[in-house]
Curated annotation (Swiss-Prot):
Belongs to the DEFL family. The gene is SCRL9. This is Putative defensin-like protein 243. Transmembrane segments: none annotated. Disulfide bonds join 33-88, 43-72, 53-82, 70-84.
Amino acid sequence: MKVEVIFLASCVLFSLIHAHLSHEEPMKEPEYCRWTNAFNGTCSDRGNPQTMCFFDFLDAHTARVMPKNCACNDLPGNKRYCECSFVCNS
């Protein structure tokens, strides 16, 4: 008798969980924006060029906006050009 009650309760529980999960909306794909800026110094002044642009981005934005795919290009006159992508619809 106990086994039947436990089995029945388990079936009800699993059906409720399934019903709840089937009503959730799928997650929307994030939209990425591009950020560019020029800075003093070269891309290799303080190590890895991608890391330099990553930190340049964080200095210009709040910590919750995380950049990705950062790239650095040297410009004439001891300058560097940074470009990063970030999620802009958060």
